[in-house]
Structure formats: structure tokens, C-alpha cells
Amino acid sequence: MKNYNLSDNINRSNILTEESNHLSKNIDTVSTSKLVDIFVEEDKKPQQAISQAKHQITKSIDLIYQRLIDNGRLFYIGAGTSGRIAVLDAVECPPTFCTSPELVQAVIAGGSSSLINSSEEKEDSNSLSIKDLKERNFSSKDCLIGITAGGTTPYVLSGLNYARNIGALNIAITSVPEQQASFGSNITIRLITGPEIIAGSTRLKAGTATKMALNIISSGVMIKLGKVFDNKMIDVSISNKKLFDRALRITSSLLNIEMKEAQLLLDQAKGSIKVACIIKSSGMDQKSAFALLERNNHNLRKALKDINIEF
């Protein structure tokens, strides 16, 4: 334990995520079945919190989308569990949507080592987050989502302040009400899940709600960017056998063709489902199909409409 001084302590007992949950009082004395019942009941609250924050989540998707089509990027920033949840979402974007690793990035206090080793003390730094963002050339064109369940994390708060000061879109995600934490951000998404089953352990309900929110935000933005057609991930990066199979099935399904023809088309299209669909639907060659996509911001539906093909 480091030498902390009581005189420097901030009493967080009034913060919602630090309060004691009366439903889990004496949880260490109940049966395993009762323990699980408590978790099952309490884990309904993240979904309710997401529903209540629908307006803010919707607005976030629209504003982030506008930034990204203007060559901006999306950053998440967090410490501890919040940072790890951010990484979970960001690293899935390249394989799912074939994005550059630069487009959606997670910045976690303590860096990559914090993914497997706790470095909670890093969250107390007011300067480290600014340094981390500057190292990634974070600019006014970009977006920053700062995640702090209790609303007090210096690493995240200073990052949000920096984003605001340089004119970047800044969005806060927290699990406490406004009277307990006010951020001055463009948008604040308040996921009010209440006191945790284990008091203060925000990896539980607050963490679950945060992951749900990030799922919706990143997926929503990618859908608007044309990374999904119908409900299929047509920009999937074919990087393993499972994803090769998925690409085959998507191509086969969209074009109503056999798997063998789907593979031939994907080979011709250099692995791009979008290009394969244009080649098959229009008779274009690979180069012309790709050029058509580029003219339509890589949006397959718009590209097909551009050549009067209804899909």
C-alpha cells in the first residue's frame, strides 16, 4: 500500500456507485441459489439504464458519425475496468468492420500492461491522459468518449477537459446522477444502475451497462458508415477460417448463389463482399466495381442505387 494521507482524501461515501445495496446485505451468509437470484435481479438494471439513456446514445451516434465522415476518429478513454471495457469494444472494430486500427482507439491508464495487470494508481494522474492523447495525435476533428462510473477519475476527467478545450467532440459515460458529477461535455450518458451488489465494484452493473452502450454506439456508427448491409457484416475482414466461412455465407445469401460461385467471386473481388456483390449484379470488373464503391463512400446500398440496381 502506498502512503496516502487522510488530509488528501476525498470522501466518496455519497457517490451512488459507492453506496451499499440493501438487496445484497448479508450476501455472504445466503445460499448459493439466493446469491445467484440477487445477481439475476440486479442485472436487469443495466438494460433499464440503457433505455433511459436512449436519447443521449442516439445523439452520440449521429455526432460521431458526422465526425468520422469528415476524417475524424473515435477514441475511448478509461482507467481500470472502464479502460478494459473500452479496449474490448475498440479492438473488435477492425475484424468486424474492416476498419483501420486507427479509426477506433481505446486509451487506458497505464497502457497495454493494464489489460492483464492492475495499475489502478495510474487513474489518479491529471496529466497522463493528456500525454496519451497527444501521442496519438488526438485533434479537434476527433471524438472522445470518457468513461468514469463514479464520475471522479482524474485520468478521464482531464482527458475530457483536454478534448473540450481543443474543440473535439467529448462525451462522458457515467453511472451517477448530475448532482454528483457534472462534466460540461457535449453529451453526458448517465447509466444509472444503482449501488453495486458488492459496494463499489463497478465492474458489475455499471460495467455491464457501459459495455452495452459502447456496443450500440460503435455498431450504430458503423452501420451508418455502410459497414452493414441488411443485418450482415459485409466489410468483414477475412483473417481466419471462421471469418472466411462467414464471408462465403454472406455472399451466397445476398446474391442467392452457391458457395462455390461465392468463393470465385470473392477471389475475383480480392476478399471484398461489397465488390463481389457489384461484380455479380452489374457485370463490372473488379477495378470498376471498387471505383464505384469509392465514389459512394464505400456504401454498397448507395453504390448499387447509383447504377440503378435494386438489391
Curated annotation (Swiss-Prot):
CDD domains of this UniProt entry?
A: SIS_Etherase
- In the UniProt entry, which residues are flagged as the active site? E92 (proton donor), E123
Give the protein's recorded name.
N-acetylmuramic acid 6-phosphate etherase
Q: Has the keyword Plastid been applied to this entry?
A: no
Q: Return the similarity comment.
A: Belongs to the GCKR-like family. MurNAc-6-P etherase subfamily.
EC number of the protein: 4.2.1.126
Subunit details:
Homodimer.
Alphabetical list of Pfam families matching this protein: GKRP-like_C, GKRP_SIS_N
Gene name of this polypeptide: murQ
Keywords, ordered alphabetically: Carbohydrate metabolism, Lyase
Q: Which domain of life is it from?
A: Bacteria
The role this protein plays is: Specifically catalyzes the cleavage of the D-lactyl ether substituent of MurNAc 6-phosphate, producing GlcNAc 6-phosphate and D-lactate.
